C-alpha cells in the first residue's frame, strides 16, 4: 500500500510541487537579476517576484504536506494492473490532479501555519543577529502577532487532526 499511495500522491500532486518549484526559481532569479544594470523587467518586478515567493512558497509547501494527513482525491483500483490499456492502479478522482489541495481549508490551515512560522523565525533571526536597536525593537513588537497567528492556524490544524474520524481497512473484507 505504501508505494501505491505515495506514487499517486507525489505524482498527482506534481502540479502543486511544480508551483512550489516555480516559487523557488523566481526567488533565485530575482535575487540574481534585480540589481543588475539593464535587467529586462526592472527592479520592482523582481521585488514583486520575491514577495510572491515569500507568500506563496511557504503556504503551498504547508498545503502539500497537509495532504499527507488529510488525504487527496484519488482512487486506487488494483484490478487495472491487468488492463493493458490502463496499467495504472491509481487515478485522480477530479480533473485538478492535486491542485485542489491548495483550496482545502484544513490544508490551508497548515500552509498558513508554515507561513507565519517562517515569519516568526525570520524575526528571531533579526533579533539575534542584527546589532541595530531600532530593528530589534520592531522585530520584537512584530514577533507577538506572528506567533499568535502561527499558533491559531497550527492548533486549529492539530486539534482537527486529533479529533477527526480516521479510516482503517477491515482485514477480513478489505473494505475501508
Report residues per predicted region.
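Hydrophobic cores of alpha-helical transmembrane segments in multi-pass integral membrane proteins
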Residues: 1-38, 43-72, 106-126, 140-176
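Membrane-interface segments at the starts/ends of alpha-helical transmembrane spans
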Residues: 7-8, 89-105
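Membrane-interfacial helical/loop segments at transmembrane boundaries in membrane proteins
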Residues: 75-96, 168-176
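Alpha-helical transmembrane segments
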Residues: 127-136
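Cytosolic juxtamembrane amphipathic/interface segments immediately preceding
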Residues: 38-45, 95-99, 132-133
